[in-house]
């Protein structure tokens, strides 16, 4: 890879997401086991979102992806179509859906995280797409991860970070205000 600042070539490890993915397979199986439900699936990776969509649709599960590339005008339309049942799985990049998306709570009570963002607040905001006025059921949040993996370690680190935020702020109400304002602290 060419370093644009120095003009020198650098060696960087490349992680390429490919199918099959055991995490996407597990989510697909869970969705198939619950044929009368709709789901929101989150990932920090746009590529993982599109891989999940391709896998789901190839097995008859209707799914659409919301990413940072989705125009504002299309976001509201996508949510409306999901609520109306035009597709079963709303797949979203965490950073793109954490703020400014409302209405998902009218369609489902289940969010599945293929992975989490390193930004604690963005994860909480993504979860809160379902924890909103109009939600009639208990919300189920599912994290797909393997023990002793990067995902497992990230999950533990994010839990520690969230506990620290609550301790520093002194009360859960203040932490909630921080979430809704969109402020985050560095990792």
Write out the residue ranges for each language-model feature.
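A general structural motif
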Residues: 36-38, 108, 138
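A short beta-strand element within the Helicase C-terminal
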Residues: 102-116, 140-143
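Short, well-ordered beta-strand core segments
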Residues: 90, 110-111, 130
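Cofactor-binding loop segments of dinucleotide-utilizing enzymes, especially the Rossmann-like FAD-
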Residues: 44, 68, 116, 144-146
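Solvent-exposed polar/charged
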Residues: 84, 106, 132-135
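A conserved SF2-helicase RecA2
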Residues: 118-187
């Amino acid at each position: 890879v060419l370093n644009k600042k120095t003009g020198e070539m650098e060696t960087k490890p490349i992680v390429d997401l490919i199918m099959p993915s055991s995490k996407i397979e597990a989510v697909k199986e869970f969705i198939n086991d619950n044929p009368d439900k709709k789901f929101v699936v989150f990932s920090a990776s746009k590529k993982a979102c599109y891989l999940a969509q391709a896998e789901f649709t190839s097995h008859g599960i209707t799914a659409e992806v919301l990413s940072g590339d989705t125009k504002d005008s299309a976001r509201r339309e996508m949510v409306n179509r999901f609520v109306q049942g035009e597709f079963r799985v709303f797949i979203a990049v965490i950073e793109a859906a954490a703020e400014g998306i409302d209405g998902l709570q009218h369609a489902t009570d289940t969010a599945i995280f293929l992975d989490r963002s390193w930004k604690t607040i963005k994860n909480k905001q993504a979860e809160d797409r379902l924890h909103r006025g109009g939600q009639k059921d208990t919300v189920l949040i599912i994290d797909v991860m393997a023990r002793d993996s990067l995902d497992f370690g990230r999950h533990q680190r994010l839990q520690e970070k969230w506990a620290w935020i609550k301790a520093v702020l002194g009360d859960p109400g203040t932490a909630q205000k921080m979430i809704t304002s969109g402020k985050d602290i560095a990792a």
